[in-house]
């Protein structure tokens, strides 16, 4: 088995105008591995949707998104990749 692997996550978010929303996305971690770091996040390249925070845990990532557009942003696809490392035994 490889020492390092990855898993992907995907969700759709809606954020009211001028609001911040934490979006928690769960991902699967194969047995014997643990989350190491976030490799990338893509928010459909929306220019008015900056990321305010990222918290990664055992099997989920919480991403804080701020809507600066002045209107509700709907159905923005949020995808990313988490790097996993094999646990030492």
Task: State what each model feature region is.
Residues 44-46, 71-72:
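Extended, low-complexity, turn-rich repeat/linker tracts enriched in Gly/Pro/Ser/Thr and Asp/Glu
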Residues 47-50, 67:
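Short structured motifs
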Residues 1-33, 58, 62, 66-89:
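Extracellular receptor-binding modules and their adjoining Ser/Thr/Gly/Asp/Asn-rich linkers
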Residues 51-56:
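Short, exposed beta-strand/loop patches in secreted or surface proteins that constitute
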